[in-house]
Amino acid sequence: MSTDTKAAQLANEYFQVKRHGDMAVLVPSPEVEHLPDTTINTAAQMVLAPLKEDPPTNLIVDLTGVRYFGSAFIAFLLRCHLPVKQQGGELVLAGVNDRVRELLKTTALDTLWALYTTRQEAMDALGGSD
């Protein structure tokens, strides 16, 4: 199996991307918190490729199933942020639990991204619907 095929499988297994017009919702699986950094980076490249080709105006990252994450996932979020910002849009986080909220506050990333309790709240704030 080629490296690209493995990367695509990882991306499909650990990340779902759903388009809603010019808005996208990225849903990492709960298992993403247990992945080694190199695996997150590999899967992230596959997830980001279509987003870079056709950047959404706004991107919601729904963290509902994710209890915590490390620096590799933060780097992934930052890489997702750039193409969206270049389009004049926003990356926002939904389904943020208290532990993740505290991590984002400690790193001051809560000032970069708006945090919402639910995906629907985020979609409403960005002018979309589910």
Labelled PLM ranges:
Residues 1-11:
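Short, solvent-exposed secondary-structure boundary motifs
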Residues 3, 68-71, 121:
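Generic signature of intrinsically disordered, low-complexity, basic-rich segments
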Residues 9-45:
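STAS-typified acidic loop motif
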Residues 18, 94, 116:
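General small-molecule cofactor/ligand-binding pocket signal
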Residues 22, 98, 120:
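Residues that form or immediately flank small-molecule/cofactor binding pockets and catalytic motifs
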Residues 32-113:
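Amphipathic alpha-helical interaction surfaces in cytosolic regulatory modules
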Residues 112-118, 122:
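Short acidic-hydrophobic, aromatic-tinged amphipathic segments that line or gate anion-handling sites
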Residues 126-130:
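A short, charged, amphipathic alpha-helix used as a generic interaction element across diverse proteins
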